[in-house]
C-alpha cells in the first residue's frame, strides 16, 4: 500500500463511513453508508483520490475521465488535476442524466470525447446502474470506454453487472473489507 493509498483509506474511514440504516440511491437498504462526497469534495482528501485512481488505472491507455453527474464529477476533476501535477494531459467530462433541452442539447458535457478512449468513474456503486448509464451515454457520444473505476466497491454485484453489461473491466481502489465493513 502506497503512503497516498493508505492516507486516503484512513480519510475514508474517518470521514465517510456512517453506520446506521440507510436507503441507497439504488433503493436498497444497508446498515452503513459510505458518503464519499465527504472525501471527493474535501480539500485534504480530494487530491488523494486523483492520485489513487490514476495509480489504479496506470496500465490503461485513456485521455479522458468522467461519469454520471454528481458522484463522478469531483472524482474526474481530482484525476484531471492529479494528472496535470504529473505532467500528463487528461480531460474530464460530465454525463447528464438526460440531455439538455436548450443550448447545445448535449448529454455529455466538456471537451469532445468522440473517437477518444475514456475511463468512466464513480465514487461508489451498489448495483452498477450509474456507471452503466454513463457507459451507454459515452458510447452514444462516440467514445471507447476502456474501464469503469470506482473509489469503493460495496461487494454487492456492481462489478459483475458492469463487466457483463458493458463488457469492460471494473476496477476499484478499496473493497468494503478494507473499510472494516464485512
From Swiss-Prot:
SUPFAM superfamilies assigned to the protein according to its UniProt record, in alphabetical order: PRTase-like
UniProt-listed Enzyme Commission number(s): 2.4.2.10
Biological processes annotated in GO: 'de novo' UMP biosynthetic process; pyrimidine nucleobase biosynthetic process; UMP biosynthetic process
GO MF entries: magnesium ion binding; orotate phosphoribosyltransferase activity
Cofactor(s) essential for the protein: Mg(2+)
Reactions the enzyme catalyzes: orotidine 5'-phosphate + diphosphate = orotate + 5-phospho-alpha-D-ribose 1-diphosphate
Keyword Glycosyltransferase in annotation: yes
UniProt keyword list: Glycosyltransferase, Magnesium, Pyrimidine biosynthesis, Transferase
Quaternary structure and interacting proteins, as annotated: Homodimer.
Family: Belongs to the purine/pyrimidine phosphoribosyltransferase family. PyrE subfamily.
NCBIfam families in UniProt: pyrE
Function, in words: Catalyzes the transfer of a ribosyl phosphate group from 5-phosphoribose 1-diphosphate to orotate, leading to the formation of orotidine monophosphate (OMP).
Matches recorded under PANTHER family: OROTATE PHOSPHORIBOSYLTRANSFERASE, URIDINE 5'-MONOPHOSPHATE SYNTHASE
Protein name (record): Orotate phosphoribosyltransferase
Organism: Streptomyces coelicolor (strain ATCC BAA-471 / A3(2) / M145)
Amino acid at each position: 500500500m502506497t503512503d497516498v493509498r493508505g492516507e486516503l483509506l484512513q480519510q475514508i474511514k474517518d470521514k465517510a463511513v456512517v453506520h446506521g440504516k440507510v436507503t441507497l440511491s439504488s433503493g436498497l437498504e444497508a446498515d452503513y453508508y459510505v458518503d464519499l462526497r465527504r472525501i471527493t469534495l474535501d480539500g485534504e482528501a480530494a487530491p488523494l483520490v486523483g492520485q489513487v485512481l490514476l495509480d489504479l488505472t496506470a496500465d490503461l491507455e485513456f485521455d479522458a475521465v468522467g461519469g454520471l453527474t454528481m458522484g463522478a464529477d469531483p472524482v474526474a476533476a481530482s484525476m484531471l488535476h492529479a494528472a496535470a501535477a504529473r505532467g500528463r494531459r487528461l480531460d474530464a467530462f460530465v454525463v447528464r442524466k438526460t440531455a439538455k433541452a436548450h443550448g447545445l442539447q448535449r448529454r455529455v458535457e466538456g471537451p469532445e470525447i468522440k473517437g477518444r478512449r475514456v475511463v468512466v468513474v464513480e465514487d461508489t456503486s451498489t448495483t452498477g446502474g450509474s456507471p452503466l448509464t454513463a457507459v451507454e451515454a459515452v458510447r452514444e457520444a462516440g467514445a471507447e470506454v476502456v474501464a469503469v473505476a470506482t473509489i469503493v466497491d460495496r461487494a454487492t454485484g456492481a462489478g459483475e453487472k458492469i463487466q457483463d453489461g458493458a463488457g469492460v473491466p471494473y476496477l476499484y481502489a478499496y473493497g468494503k473489507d478494507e473499510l472494516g465493513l464485512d
